């Protein structure tokens, strides 16, 4: 089904499960999308926003999340805040694979808290081109992902990001970040790799940063853990 503009019918999936299921505290899986009466697009939903999509979905399993992701098409995301808190409610998920989503032509400005609190997440794939020159806020994006060991951001363009605050705060087991973090437009970065040594990325090595702001200092790392290129 398409409207007169030639676009498919779009669905705002902000807080989708929280708004459609009375009590999420014991829900472990979803058989069908709640209240989706249309059942069109061959079980595909074209989303306009994913803001808070998995909010409060603490017991959703890897399999449940993978199934939901496979049914969502993000080609027409129009909300510039579409990725705020998208996965932040997932507490037991150990793997996320977003390769079915193509981020290359999106212009999402705000990704604050996108994966915040995914404390059992060990493996994250399919985030190529997630952050681009239009992205402004990645505050707390991976904060408290305490099981995450490595991440590949080699295809990211962070040159337009203004807020890096607490981006990796609480990522105790993070060992490797593949790629370079460009802080050309940075205005805020407090606690980027930990508010202090106690919440810092103590196992991280070989971090590469370019264009740091004046007076650059990372509270959660020591200078042997990163280099300015």
Residues covered by each model-derived region:
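Negatively charged
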Residues: 1-229
